[in-house]
Amino acid sequence: KFDAPLPSDFRPKIRDRYREAFATRLRAIPGVHDTITSLQAMLAVASGSSPEGLVQKLHQTGLSEYFGQHVYSSHQVERGKPAPDLFLFTAESLGVRPGACTVIEDSAKGIKAAVSANMRAIGFTGGGHCGPGHADSLLAEGANAVVKHMRDLRNVV
């Protein structure tokens, strides 16, 4: 039935399955470690995830070491993406002017936020959630370039 109410335990079960899947299946995007090492730049993470979720994801993928304390969540600002608040907060925290920042983003909302913050925006379509037309949606929001593989970031950053 399509009009049947959901069981009361539906949301908790979905949340638990989501957490279990992340805990057992989350892996770093191929090539990300080599790419980060080769960039020779000040790096930060600015994500819509919760602070706790960010720490868990970075630790599980082995990426924590690259960012140190420079991990920022939309929970730290008034408005999340597509507003520029998170990226502006990150730049300010790093002591860098927005125009000197480059954002690597896999979402159209994130590209829009980067453009609104007057930052260079590079779209990334190598994630499992990126299907046909995703690159076009990133370009439509103002991405300066779009790459599918992490190794290609070196050519556009």
Q: Which functions belong to the PLM regions below?
A:
Residues A44:
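Conserved serine/cysteine hydrolase catalytic core
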